[in-house]
Structure formats: C-alpha cells, structure tokens
Amino acid sequence: VKPEYRLVEAPARVFDTQGDVKKAYQAGELNKDVIVVVRFQGPGANGMPELHSLTPILGSLQDDGHHVALVTDGRMSGASGKIPNAIHLSPEGVRGGPIARLRDGDPLRLNCETGELNFLGDVEEFNARAPAVHVPNQTDTGLGRELFATMRAEAGDAASGASFFRFAGMN
C-alpha cells in the first residue's frame, strides 16, 4: 500500500457478502470515501472464502481519488497490496465480535502505519448495540454447507489459525 493511502478515515458501508459489495459498486453507491466492511466471512461463518475479487473494485475507487479501505473478518491473498485493509478480525462477526456491531455510516479510522482500526463514534452506544445475526445465504444450501457445519461450528478464530483440530496447548 502506497504511503499516501495508509491512513483512511471514512464512514463505514457494511455488507454481509462480497456479492453485495459488487452490486453496490455497480449501482454507483460506493463512489465516495468509504471503509467497506464485509462481515460474516470468517472460519465459523463460511470458511473464510478468498475476498481478492474486491481489490479491483476498491482499486478503481481509489484510482478515482477516493480514500477507501476494506475491513473484514475474512481473508485476502498476498496479491491484494494496493488497498489498505484490516483482515482476519477476531473474534469474528458470527461469534459476536465487534465487526457485527458496525452499521452503515459509522465513522472509522484505519491506520496501516500503527496497525489500528478505530471506531470514532460514541463508544458507549457502540458497545450497547446488539450484534447483527448471520443469516446463511439460502442459495448455498446443498453445496456442502450441511456437510461441513460441524467443522464451522468448531473452527477456532482466525487469530489462532482457524483450525477445528484441538491439540494440547491450543485455545
């Protein structure tokens, strides 16, 4: 990430799927300074799919002069270095992590120099919010979600490796 893009202060736009991000982009809803939040992408929700397809979208917005960033409990590949991002947020949204309490318009600051992601609004009000509830996409039914439900339920958080195996000394 180029130095001039490493600090982003902008309102959040919250999504539950990367497909919804793409639809908002195509509708022109993201043509502004924005921190795109994609929650429910962690190991316990849907197994941490690759979110690299969002890089061209966010890169286009950045190229148009907007300050943009991505915040997610999911993952991105190492080829995603153009856009500032905070990934693998833990605890993840499906487990009630702070990302599940974010709402559209929430003021955020992502500082890639210090590694900090800050909520700039009323912290007491934020902490009092009920977390959003993950609703699995019904079109995914029958594509293995049922088979791997036990593994998703047992998966550790991204910060500890997202494993569903439990060895001595593991959290």
Regions found by a protein language model. Name each.
Residues 1-171:
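Feature captures the catalytic cores and cofactor-binding loops of soluble hydro-lyases/lyases
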